[in-house]
């Protein structure tokens, strides 16, 4: 299948296989691949650009051993350690972000899951946010139980985030304290309750292009419409501290393939993009990135909101209040 044939097939509503995607990844004409992804982005998603922000509401001392993560208690890193933030601080940040035109605000906590006592504080915080702002609330709190997810949903959280992080076949190489099956159980339960799902991963953790394609196809089959894509930023003290940063062309090829495989999804700039040159960031936006977490991130440098808005609009996007994945 040529790049042109793949593009036309997708534009007509077809899907490409993992084998076809891998063949396209190896095609020497990268610019043609990038342009095909751009046309698919515009055809299915228009020029809408979706923004969200997060707050690291509980940091460090995590029981899990994810090899990339600064917050794992298994490794000695320079991450700040603190318990669950008080409601007042979270509410302040939510209101502040909404005033900057950001659509959604996520509370993110370290750990395998929050305790029931912590969840009581979190749901109270969410209700306070909803009383003081019209910002939409999201949460990323690990492998919550069904009853915990239900309480979170009832408090006003609409979207639940749980990354699969990498290809299902590769996950066990990166984490031994929980499984991809546990992640998927959480995601399926959250969806059954009524949450919209945000799920993606980290690129550049030693996985092959074939495994990235596996992840992209897995997310497509799961019907995920918000896919955060992080670029690994090696954290000193973690097992991945000496991992070589991904070549920018390989990152761009990955974005193009995620777009071809997930034509209807918001592909979201997330952690690590500050490592990319401005040229590559702009090219990522041209190819298929059409959403972003903006502001401060969890344990890496985030972005300045106004500078990001200029960047996104200069690449032809319109910052929108309404995004299809929220319907």
UniProtKB/Swiss-Prot annotation:
Subunit structure: Homodimer.
Catalytic reaction annotation: (4R,5S)-dethiobiotin + (sulfur carrier)-SH + 2 reduced [2Fe-2S]-[ferredoxin] + 2 S-adenosyl-L-methionine = (sulfur carrier)-H + biotin + 2 5'-deoxyadenosine + 2 L-methionine + 2 oxidized [2Fe-2S]-[ferredoxin]
Residues where [2Fe-2S] cluster binds: 138, 198, 268
BP GO annotations: biotin biosynthetic process
Disulphides: none
Gene3D superfamilies: Aldolase class I
Note on how the cofactor is bound: Binds 1 [4Fe-4S] cluster. The cluster is coordinated with 3 cysteines and an exchangeable S-adenosyl-L-methionine. Binds 1 [2Fe-2S] cluster. The cluster is coordinated with 3 cysteines and 1 arginine.
Organism: Parabacteroides distasonis (strain ATCC 8503 / DSM 20701 / CIP 104284 / JCM 5825 / NCTC 11152)
Class in the EC hierarchy, top level: transferase
Every Radical SAM core domain range: 44-273
Protein name, as recorded: Biotin synthase
Enzyme Commission no: 2.8.1.6
Protein family per UniProt: Belongs to the radical SAM superfamily. Biotin synthase family.
InterPro entries: Aldolase_TIM, BATS_dom, Biotin_synth/BioAB, Biotin_synthase, Elp3/MiaA/NifB-like_rSAM, rSAM
This protein's encoding gene: bioB
Biological role: Catalyzes the conversion of dethiobiotin (DTB) to biotin by the insertion of a sulfur atom into dethiobiotin via a radical-based mechanism.
Cofactors, names only: [4Fe-4S] cluster; [2Fe-2S] cluster
Record GO terms (molecular function): 2 iron, 2 sulfur cluster binding; 4 iron, 4 sulfur cluster binding; biotin synthase activity; iron ion binding
Binding, [4Fe-4S] cluster: 62, 66, 69
Top-level division of the source organism's lineage: Bacteria
Pathway: Cofactor biosynthesis; biotin biosynthesis; biotin from 7,8-diaminononanoate: step 2/2
Keywords: 2Fe-2S, 4Fe-4S, Biotin biosynthesis, Iron, Iron-sulfur, Metal-binding, S-adenosyl-L-methionine, Transferase
């Amino acid at each position: 299948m040529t790049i042109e044939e793949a593009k036309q097939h997708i534009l007509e509503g077809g899907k490409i296989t993992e084998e076809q995607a891998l063949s396209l990844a190896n095609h020497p004409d990268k610019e043609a691949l990038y342009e095909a992804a751009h046309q698919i982005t515009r055809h299915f998603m228009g020029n809408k650009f979706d923004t969200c922000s997060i707050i690291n509401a509980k940091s460090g001392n995590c029981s899990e051993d994810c090899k990339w993560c600064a917050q794992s208690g298994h490794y000695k890193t320079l991450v700040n350690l603190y318990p669950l933030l008080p409601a007042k601080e979270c509410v302040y940040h939510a209101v502040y972000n909404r005033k900057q035109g950001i659509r959604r605000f996520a509370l993110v906590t370290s750990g395998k899951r929050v305790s029931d006592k912590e969840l009581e504080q979190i749901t109270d915080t969410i209700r306070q946010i909803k009383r003081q702002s019209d910002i939409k609330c999201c949460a990323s709190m690990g492998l919550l139980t069904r009853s915990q997810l239900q309480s979170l949903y009832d408090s006003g959280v609409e979207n639940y985030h749980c990354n699969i992080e990498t290809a299902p076949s590769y996950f066990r190489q990166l984490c031994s304290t929980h499984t991809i099956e546990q992640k998927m159980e959480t995601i399926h339960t959250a969806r059954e309750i009524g949450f919209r799902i945000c799920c993606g991963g980290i690129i550049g953790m030693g996985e092959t292009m074939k495994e990235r394609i596996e992840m992209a196809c897995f997310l497509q089959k799961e019907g995920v419409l918000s896919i955060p894509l992080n670029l690994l930023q090696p954290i000193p003290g973690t097992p991945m501290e000496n991992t070589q940063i991904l070549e920018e062309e390989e990152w761009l090829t990955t974005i193009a393939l995620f777009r071809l495989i997930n034509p209807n999804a918001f592909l979201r700039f997330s952690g690590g993009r500050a490592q990319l040159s401005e040229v590559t960031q702009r090219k990522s936006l041209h190819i298929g990135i059409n959403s972003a977490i903006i502001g401060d991130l969890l344990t890496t440098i985030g972005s300045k909101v106004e500078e990001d808005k200029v960047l996104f609009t200069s690449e032809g996007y319109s910052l929108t209040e309404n995004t299809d994945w929220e319907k």
